[in-house]
Each structure stands twice: as structure tokens, then as C-alpha cells.
Regions:
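Radical SAM/AdoMet-radical enzyme domain recognition
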Residues: 1-90
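Flexible glycine/acidic-rich beta-alpha junction loops that bind and position SAM and/or redox cofactors
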Residues: 45-51, 67-130, 137
């Protein structure tokens, strides 16, 4: 069972508006109780999510602890799988895609790269996957025009929804102007 999210917890409501985190987790737990079921939380990799992917992994690992499912489950064919997984999913990329990682200013990228180190050991266990994301943050050029387009889109969305980017993601404050 794949559950498509953008963030772990109530932050998810910002991009997946409106969503109720309690309902998402409640439904995930129901599916986890079904036999031969594997739960995967999947997200896109975009300008807002890339700095928070460790929180998703950490949340999934918390469910593994809660369900004591670190060792995996052996199915009827003898294959071992873990009940709870996460996947970084698709990379937002391409001409005109406002939420591509290239729209992230360099100072925010530094903040996000530092976050990857804050989570420590469990990131080292999956080093290759995390290194790809880290390298992407570090090496992709900043696209200032795309950044401006993204911020304009965010501001219009916030005005329409009655939300505010910087209430959830304060690192964007220097770049955010309320309409």
C-alpha cells in the first residue's frame, strides 16, 4: 500500500491541502493490520520537501519501533520485507516546473544539507540514497527566475487558502512577501 504524502505530520497539510494527518495515520495503521501488507510512504522531491525528507524517514522508523517490525516479515514465498517503508518518489524537474530544487536559494540549501546531518545514524545506514539527495542540493545551480515564479505561486496559493509558508517553513522568511 503506497500512501502519497509530502511531509510527515501536520506539515503535510501545507502542500496537500486540505489533509488531516490523524486520518492518514489512522488509515495507514488499518492497512498495516492486514496480512501480507507493506506500507510505503512516498513523496515527491521538490523545493519545499527536500529539506524535510529525513523527517519522513524518521517518522517511518518510529512506526517500525512501535510495531517492532525492524527485522522484517517473511511472506509465503520466503521473501523478507519490512512492514513500514518510505520512498523519496519522483523528482520534480523540467522546464517551467516552479517547485524544482533549482528554485531553492543557496542559503536555504545549506540549512537543508545541515538537517541531513542532524538525523545521524539512520541516514548513514542508507548512505547512498541520502548522498544522492545531498549532492543534488549541493551541485544544482540556482535558478533565480524559477525561484521568483515559485514564490509568486506560493503567495497566491497562501492568499487563496488562508495559509502562510513561513508559519510552517520559517527558513523562507527572507524570500516571502505576503500579498
Amino acid at each position: 500500500m503506497t500512501i502519497s504524502i509530502e511531509f510527515w505530520g501536520n506539515k503535510n497539510n501545507y502542500l496537500r491541502f486540505p489533509s488531516k494527518w490523524e486520518v492518514i495515520i489512522k488509515n495507514a495503521r488499518k492497512f498495516a493490520d492486514c496480512p501480507r501488507t507493506r506500507i510505503v510512504f512516498a513523496t515527491t522531491v521538490n523545493a519545499l520537501t527536500i529539506g524535510y525528507l529525513p523527517e519522513i524517514a524518521y517518522g517511518v522508523y518510529g512506526l517500525r519501533d512501535e510495531y517492532d517490525s525492524w527485522s522484517g516479515i517473511i511472506n509465503e514465498n520466503g521473501f523478507t520485507y519490512n512492514l513500514w517503508h518510505w520512498a523519496s518518489g519522483s523528482l520534480v524537474w523540467g522546464d517551467g516546473n516552479q517547485y524544482a530544487v533549482t528554485a531553492i536559494p543557496l542559503d536555504i540549501r545549506e540549512t537543508y544539507m545541515y538537517k541531513y546531518f542532524e538525523y545521524g545514524d539512520f541516514l548513514r545506514e542508507e548512505y547512498v540514497e541520502w548522498q544522492k539527495l545531498y549532492d543534488y542540493l549541493e551541485n544544482m545551480p540556482f535558478d533565480e527566475e524559477l525561484h521568483k515564479e515559485m514564490m509568486k505561486d506560493i503567495q497566491v496559493r497562501d492568499k487563496h487558502r488562508g495559509t502562510c509558508l513561513t508559519d510552517i517553513f520559517p527558513e523562507w522568511e527572507p524570500y516571502y512577501e505576503k500579498l
